[in-house]
């Protein structure tokens, strides 16, 4: 007997399993993972979004909650699973899973705990999506991007850390607040380590091509009576402040990740400060991942922009690299 569906639908194509062409997987459905997921969904970047986590009840609940909002989205399929087979065929895999940073805890203190988690995550991702781009968000992001590269066996241009994309966004927001100009028209870069030893490029700050350093030579120095140096301190402190106030950060990093995902999925070739292998750049001799301005496309990182840094900025970058290497060299994975 014909079902209601049979009475309603006349079949034209032969029955076949639908294929996903722009699939994105988010690993970890904590506050950051779900902020990434909803930000990606709101930008209509994928025809399928998969969620993966070890907490099955929460995972199913988050999936159902998003599915129930499907009418308001343009992503055809939202799935979830504890098994990484659900992630198969992903173009982009966003990793947010890991131990959460506690109040007052530096990102680098998280390292070994999260390395142990990555040992289980990375091989399964590569097994099911061997051609994917991996975007690492878990902290400490620079070290864990290095770990993901080592564990995955993928070429380095397909392993990206979210890095200083958010630091730079915070920097530009605070810059705009001071100047009364929207952050999209304020240009400034934060490079190096995501977090405590990040490097603000004072020499590159501009609005409409007008160099702030030329207008105000003391910019970013201890001699600056306007204390613009506090801008970078506020960037570094901001995550700790948000964690102190609400227990974790989520929305800004979620929006930052969706920004990166958009550039990758749409092959936009935009420049972002993301974490990549920096060996042989700016006198750095070790295998460390730090943020530099990178051109992103649908293959991952296609190019690195060679910023002209002042000697003190270059020294800070080298110091940042040394800080990370001192931790990396003792990792067990």
From Swiss-Prot:
The modification N-acetylalanine is found at residue 2. Keywords: Acetylation, Cytoplasm, NAD, Oxidoreductase. NAD(+) binds at residues 30-58, 100, 139. It catalyses: (S)-lactate + NAD(+) = pyruvate + NADH + H(+). It comes from the Eukaryota. One of its GO terms (molecular function) is L-lactate dehydrogenase activity. Signal peptide: none annotated. Its EC number is 1.1.1.27. Its main location: cytoplasm. The keyword Acetylation applies. CDD domains: LDH_1. Substrate binds at residues 107, 139, 170, 249. The keyword Phosphoprotein does not apply. It is found in: Cytoplasm. Pathway: Fermentation; pyruvate fermentation to lactate; (S)-lactate from pyruvate: step 1/1. One of its GO terms (cellular component) is cytoplasm. GO terms for biological process: lactate metabolic process. The active site is at residue 194. It holds the Pfam family Ldh_1_N. NCBIfam families: L-LDH-NAD. Belongs to the LDH/MDH superfamily. LDH family. Homotetramer. Interconverts simultaneously and stereospecifically pyruvate and lactate with concomitant interconversion of NADH and NAD(+). This is L-lactate dehydrogenase A chain. It comes from Squalus acanthias (Spiny dogfish).
């Amino acid at each position: 007997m014909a079902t209601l569906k049979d009475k309603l639908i006349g079949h034209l194509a032969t029955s076949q399993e639908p294929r996903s062409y722009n699939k994105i997987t988010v690993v970890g459905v904590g506050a950051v993972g779900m902020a990434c997921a909803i930000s990606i969904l709101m930008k209509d970047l994928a025809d399928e979004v998969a969620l993966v986590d070890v907490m099955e009840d929460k995972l199913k609940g988050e999936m159902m909650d998003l599915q129930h909002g499907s009418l308001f989205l343009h992503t055809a399929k939202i799935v979830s699973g504890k098994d990484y087979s659900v992630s198969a065929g992903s173009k982009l895999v966003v990793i947010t899973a890991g131990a959460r940073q506690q109040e007052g805890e530096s990102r680098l203190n998280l390292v070994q705990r999260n390395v142990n988690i990555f040992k289980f995550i990375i091989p399964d991702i590569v097994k099911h999506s061997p051609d994917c781009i991996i975007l690492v968000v878990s902290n400490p992001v620079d070290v864990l991007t290095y770990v993901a590269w080592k564990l995955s066996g993928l070429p380095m241009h397909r392993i990206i850390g979210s890095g200083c994309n958010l630091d730079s966004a915070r920097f530009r927001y605070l810059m705009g607040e001071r100047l009364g100009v929207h952050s999209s028209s304020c240009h400034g870069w934060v490079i190096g380590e995501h977090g405590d030893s990040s490097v603000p490029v004072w020499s590159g700050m501009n609005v409409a091509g007008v160099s702030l350093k030329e207008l105000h030579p003391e910019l970013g120095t201890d001699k600056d009576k306007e204390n613009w140096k506090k801008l970078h301190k506020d960037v570094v402190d901001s995550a700790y402040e948000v964690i102190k106030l609400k227990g974790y950060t989520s929305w800004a990093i979620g929006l930052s990740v969706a920004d990166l995902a958009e550039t990758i999925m749409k092959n936009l070739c935009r420049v972002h400060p993301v974490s990549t292998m920096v060996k042989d750049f700016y006198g750095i001799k070790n295998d460390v991942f730090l943020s530099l301005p990178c051109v992103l496309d649908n293959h991952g990182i296609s190019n690195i922009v060679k910023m002209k840094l002042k000697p003190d900025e270059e020294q800070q970058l080298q110091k940042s690299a040394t800080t990370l290497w001192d931790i990396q060299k003792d990792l067990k994975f």
